[in-house]
Amino acid sequence: MEDSRNLNIDAIAKYSANLPDVETVQILGLRPHPEAKTLCEQIQSNNLERIVIAGDMPGYFKPVFTKAMAMTGGNTNEIRLASFQEHGARGENAMDRAKAIVACASMGVPFALAAIPGGNPVNHATLIIGGGIAGIQSALEIANAGKQVYLVEQTGTIGGHMAMFDKTFPTLDCAACILTPKMVSVGQHEMIRLLTRSKVVAVTGKPGSYRVKIRQSARYVDINACVACNQCAEVCPVKVESEFDAGISLRKAIYIPFPQAVPNAYLVDETNCLYIQSEGKKCGACVKKCPKECIDLSETDRTIDIEVGNIIIATGYELLDVSKIEQYGYGVYPNVLTSLEFERLTNASGTTGGRIVTKTKRLNKKTQEEEWIFSPEGIPPRSVALIHCVGSRNKKYNPYCSRVCCMYSLKFAHLIKEKIPNVAVYEFYIDMRAFGKGYEEFAERIKQEGTFVVRGHTASVAMNNEQMIVRGEDIFNDRLVEFKVDMVVLAVGLIPAPGTEEISR
């Protein structure tokens, strides 16, 4: 044991001698290194299997002890350091802390992982912020271990982005088949309290004991009474873009996000509800139609206070605003889509029943203006361009790689070729980030299926005589290229979900 100016080394040595399996304790003081030969003899005479060097700078003595242990044929990995300085054995409770540091080293337990003497009791409940697949899986694992979980989700259902997907990569498994049983388990688990349409507004306390204030927005529908009969939505006169369908279809002001939603009950979009916005002067058709009388348009928000010991932030992601990247024509050319829009287009539960078609122009009878929509009777594209890294790895937008874009773009290529065998598919990529198990094999499979893979930056998407032209570079062949396509899918960069930074503070 090394000398320390701020601690009673004799007392620590006496304490150490009484620890389990401790054979001998020596105080080295400030003297020079002991000889390795002498230490070797002491190790052999005491049959030592582990040596703990304790003090402010125990690493100073480690080389000679390592040499001595090697001379005996012992395990040099069993030379353990118990650093008082590194682990903060100073000031109040310094002696207790120093003893704990020595005890941990003696028992082979890292001090950073051990309980600190005098710590407060830990609340075993966990708050999980975010009800996507990460939050769902975390909630189930903790709840199945017998611990209370509070799962907070700001939308009207759990499921997150994964609920929007058709297939997963690289196995091409059904996304809903994986996700929906987990969603049901969360909704029925006795150890999970699910709070949808909720946001965390304040967190106080310290690790192991947090007090959390949650604001739950009014749903206006009693989830225990609602039977999801859809009669309320049938009479609702308001139509707005569906968030779940990434805006490519419409929903009502009273709606259920998707058929497998949990809770499986309707909710009211107060921003677009005529009754709420007019303060009760207009509409109210849903209230009159509901056979269960479970709609209350006068419901107000409420505040919920909980106490937990752990907080998991699983708030997920959003897509970068791709309209800022003007060279790709998003919002200008009707058949330029984001990755999430294409996910919903190709999904069997989507607006076209999974048929991949180009948009159709029609007259909006209400506004008397022409608009572009996806129709199940639409025309399939003859050629599709998939552009990687839209907004990713770009100093103007996101300097980082979003990690998933390469693989889901390859998945899109497979789905397109599967549903439209004679279509021409072009993958424009910068670097193929196939980093996971089976990813490289999946990339090779897509190439073998006939997808044209072009490496290089994509410069622009333009329109010429009602035909989209994708211009870019082909690095492998040292040339500039142009391809005529009917549809463009943008692999848009990911950004943290809104409010994540605020939560972290």
What are these regions (language model features)?
Residues 126-150:
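N-terminal Rossmann-like FAD-binding beta1-loop-alpha1 element of flavoenzymes
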Residues 16-37, 64-83, 113-117, 155-181, ...:
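Non-heme iron-sulfur electron-transfer modules
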Residues 10-70, 89-101, 163-215, 429-466, ...:
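N-terminal Rossmann-like dinucleotide/flavin-binding domain of flavoprotein oxidoreductases
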Residues 1-13:
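N-terminal basic/disordered segments at the start of proteins
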Residues 132-134, 157, 227, 231:
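Residue-level detector of alpha-helix initiation sites
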Residues 148-188, 243-278, 302, 396-454:
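Rossmann-like dinucleotide-binding cores of NAD(P)H-dependent redox enzymes
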Residues 205, 230-242, 309-310, 314-322, ...:
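Glycine-/small-residue-rich beta->alpha transition segments that form the dinucleotide
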Residues 82, 96-122, 246-276, 318-418, ...:
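Glycine-rich dinucleotide-binding loop and its adjacent helix/turn
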